[in-house]
Regions:
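Flexible "cap/lid" loop of the alpha/beta hydrolase fold
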Residues: 111-149
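Active-site loop/oxyanion-hole signature of alpha/beta-hydrolase fold enzymes
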Residues: 6, 34, 47-92, 102-103, ...
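Conserved HGGG/HGGXW glycine-rich cap/lid loop of the alpha/beta-hydrolase fold
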Residues: 12-58, 267
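Acidic catalytic loop of the alpha/beta-hydrolase fold
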Residues: 209-210, 234-238
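Short beta-strand/loop motif that positions the catalytic acidic residue
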Residues: 223, 229-231
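Alpha/beta-hydrolase fold catalytic core
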Residues: 1-22, 41-45, 70-71, 75-78, ...
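Catalytic active-site module of serine/aspartate enzymes centered on a nucleophile-bearing elbow/loop
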Residues: 251-285
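Conserved alpha/beta-hydrolase catalytic His-Asp/Glu region
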Residues: 149-221
Length: 285
C-alpha cells in the first residue's frame, strides 16, 4: 500500500526498465490486469494501481472522480520512484490516463488507450442492458438502492459471470483462475461501504466527458504523448464507432482494431493484446 492522501494499493508484476502503469476501468481493480500484466514485463517494470474508491484504495482526502484519479496516477508514478511512465488505461482508466497526459504531461512518456471511455456514438448507442447498468444508477435516488437490490439477488460469482458476459465477446476465453480472482475482488468490494458511492461519483464524472463530444475533442487534442488506441470491434459499452471517431480526430495516433473482441482485450485476448502493445512500444522507443 502507498499512502497518497489515503491508502492506495499498487500491484507490482515485476520487470526491469521504464515504468509501465496499468489503470483499470469503472468498477474494476488491479485484478483486471492479472492476465496481461505479467506478459508485459519484458518491456519494463509493470505495476497496476487501484484508483481512488476502487479495489482496496479507500477514499481519503481525495474523491473518486476521473479528475482526482488523473492526479493520483501522476502521484503514483512519483511514489514508485519514476519521473514518468507509459500509461495503459482501459475504459474509465483510459479517460483517467488521458487527463493525466494533459494535466501532468511531463509524467507521461507514452499512452496506450484500451477501449477507453469515449463520446457516445449516435449511430450505435449502448444497448438497453448497458444503459441500465451505467446510466440507470445516475438517476437521483436510484443508484444506491438499485445496487443493493442487485447484490442481494446475485452472488459474487453470478455478478462476475454477468459482468464478463457484458464486457467480452466470448467470456469463455477468460482463464478460470482470472475469473476466480475477479470474483474474490468482487466479494471484498461488497464489504466496503464506500464502494457504491464511489462508483456513482466516478460514473457521474465520466458522463461529464462522454456526453459532451466537443469537450472530449478538446481533451484529446491536448495530448502530446505518442498514443496507441486499441479497441475491440464487439465492444458493447464503448462502440467501435467512437474509437474510429477518436482515430480520425488524431490521425497521428496508432489505431489497432481487435476483430471479434469486446471491452476488455487484456482479459479476453491477452496474448494478442500484449503483442500489439509490445510491438508498438518497440517501434516508438
Amino acid at each position: 500500500m502507498l499512502d497518497i492522501g489515503g491508502p492506495i494499493r499498487v500491484t507490482d508484476y515485476g520487470g526491469q526498465g521504464p515504468l509501465i502503469l496499468l489503470v483499470h476501468g469503472l468498477g474494476g481493480s488491479t485484478e483486471n490486469w492479472d492476465v496481461a500484466g505479467p506478459l508485459l514485463t519484458g518491456s519494463g517494470r509493470v505495476c497496476a494501481v487501484d484508483l481512488i474508491g476502487f479495489g482496496e484504495s479507500t477514499p481519503g482526502e481525495r474523491g473518486p472522480s476521473v479528475e482526482e484519479n488523473g492526479l493520483l496516477v501522476a502521484d503514483v508514478i512519483d511514489a514508485i520512484g519514476y519521473d514518468n511512465a507509459t500509461l495503459i488505461g482501459n475504459s474509465m482508466g483510459g479517460l483517467v490516463s488521458m487527463i493525466t497526459a494533459v494535466e501532468h504531461a511531463s509524467r507521461v512518456d507514452r499512452l496506450v488507450l484500451v477501449d477507453p471511455a469515449l463520446p457516445v456514438s449516435r449511430r450505435h448507442p449502448p444497448d438497453f442492458e448497458v444503459l441500465t447498468k451505467l446510466i440507470g444508477p445516475l438517476v437521483p435516488g436510484i443508484g444506491v438502492p438499485a445496487f443493493r437490490v442487485y447484490r442481494a439477488a446475485h452472488s459474487p460469482e453470478e455478478e462476475t459471470a454477468e459482468t464478463l458476459r457484458m464486457v467480452t465477446a466470448n467470456s469463455e476465453t477468460v482463464p478460470e483462475w482470472a475469473r476466480d480472482r475477479l470474483t474474490d475482488a468482487n466479494r471484498r468490494r461488497r464489504r466496503h461501504g464506500w464502494a457504491i458511492p464511489s462508483f456513482l461519483e466516478a460514473d457521474r464524472s465520466i458522463a461529464r466527458y462522454v456526453l459532451r463530444p466537443r469537450r472530449f475533442s478538446r481533451l484529446i487534442h491536448k495530448i502530446s504523448a505518442p498514443t496507441l488506441l486499441v479497441h475491440g470491434s464487439e465492444d458493447r459499452l464503448v462502440s467501435v464507432d467512437s474509437a474510429r471517431w477518436a482515430a480520425e480526430q488524431r490521425p497521428d495516433w496508432t489505431y489497432e482494431e481487435m476483430e471479434g473482441v469486446g471491452h476488455v482485450p487484456m482479459l479476453e485476448a491477452a496474448e494478442w493484446f500484449v503483442d500489439l502493445v509490445t510491438d508498438w512500444l518497440e517501434a516508438t522507443t
